[in-house]
């Protein structure tokens, strides 16, 4: 009803439509690529229009809370997951990748830092029951803030986490320049 022209394409055929787009969204994609920089360059050069919007969501790996939780509980680096995950990102590395390749980041936010539960003493890694319990607590945290009309604080919190390099996921909003 909004007259939106949207296409879904695999990375191997990004420009199959031989057209440019205003928005490209890559949610949990970049970490699966062997050469994420090549894909970002292709999007910048051939897929997005000038001033087009690129939205990327990736796991925030090797963050300080994750590493501290690993050390506290003497865990392996559970987030290293080949062959599925081939590339790993932090807020700094994601920012550098995009800025180096012709994008200006105008917003970055993180998601709830689940690794805090490890630091609280709840060893959820490898424990699906406890993992589900921790996930429910995160959901309740967000729902309760929203019910109290504190969404602005929640979003500011997630932006601050991204600035600190913390949070489970990173979502980046960048404009092609």
Label the predicted regions:
Residues 27, 58-60, 78, 142-148:
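N-terminal start-of-chain detector that recognizes signal peptides
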Residues 1-73, 83-100, 172-177:
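Conserved SAM-binding loop
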Residues 65, 71-72, 77, 148, ...:
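Short leucine-rich amphipathic alpha-helices used at interfaces
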Residues 15-17, 81-86, 116, 133-138:
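Short, surface-exposed, polar/charged, turn-prone segments marking secondary-structure boundaries
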Residues 110-177:
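A C-terminal cap/extension of S-adenosyl-L-methionine-dependent methyltransferases
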Residues 91-111, 144-150:
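A SAM-dependent methyltransferase catalytic signature shared across enzymes that methylate proteins
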Residues 70-80, 123-128:
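Short glycine/proline- and charge-enriched loop/turn segments
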Residues 17-19, 23, 42-45, 84, ...:
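A broadly tuned preference for mixed-charge, low-complexity surface segments
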């Amino acid at each position: 009803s909004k007259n939106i022209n949207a296409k879904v394409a695999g990375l191997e055929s990004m420009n199959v439509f031989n057209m440019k787009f205003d928005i490209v969204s890559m949610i949990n994609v970049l970490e699966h690529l062997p050469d994420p920089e090549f894909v970002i360059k292709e999007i910048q050069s051939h897929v997005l229009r000038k001033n087009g919007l690129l939205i990327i969501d990736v796991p925030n790996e090797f963050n300080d809370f994750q590493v501290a939780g690993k050390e506290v509980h003497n865990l392996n680096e559970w987030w290293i997951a080949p062959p599925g995950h081939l590339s790993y990102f932090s807020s700094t590395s994601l920012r550098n990748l995009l800025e180096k390749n012709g994008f200006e980041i105008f917003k970055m936010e993180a998601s709830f830092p689940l690794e805090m539960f490890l630091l609280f003493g709840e060893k959820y890694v490898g424990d699906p029951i406890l993992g589900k319990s921790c996930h429910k607590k995160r959901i309740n945290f967000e729902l309760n803030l929203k019910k109290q009309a504190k969404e602005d604080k929640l979003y500011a919190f997630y932006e601050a986490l991204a600035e600190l390099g913390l949070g489970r996921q990173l979502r980046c909003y960048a404009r092609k320049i």
